[in-house]
């Protein structure tokens, strides 16, 4: 299993350690006597365990490099607050800026402002399309649409005929793209898909909403959640109402509780985009750009998706509990 992962992600390891191309023009010059400060702003909600792992990756990289990293995110999925955070960060004139961009229209003005001030930018996790408008060093994440296709392929193997899709962040372009890919493949195979939005901050409400939906839609035999904030309360619900495990539950991303659910048979698979890498790699790449003007040859560095299921869940359980997977 270890050899399999090394082979799959070797290109990313090489990109971190080797000079791969000349950089684009930038007016900033590196002063070796000046402490490097990188600012990172993501849309990760305070209650979302996915982003605690991503921030761990960024912080680990900054410690190993001996540079300063400042990480922040809104309490909730709030693009107004996030844009204000980005504007405030720009005013501090950081050496580099790392951003997730889940809503391009809402964040465009702030990102353009950073670019005009010659602050180097790396985008992670969401919003790779912004590279068509703004000079971005690279994007670190996965193709969400392709990940949706992959989720559908795995779900079809379970023989499902009617699927419920749970969206915990309405307006997040990444989740929309996941759903689009998922829905496309299932529709082509005559599988119906219905989407229900939830309030990620209220797990109890999520459970009751899904309970009511399943009660009135008894043909549903599959559920896909677009992230752990949807999956965790539904796992607990299905343990109560579906002990025979007739409803096949799958999710994007994972936490220790998701891994436990896979090992217990309550979750059939999780799609892994390696958020630790999405935090770690941008800090390394930004530091290389600031100090040595290195940039990746490829505009997108893909960290996923891969499948975590009963066959390999044990391999990542301890790492997930440690906060690095």
Language model segments and positions:
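C-terminal motif of bacterial Sec signal peptides marking the signal peptidase cleavage site
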Residues: 18-21
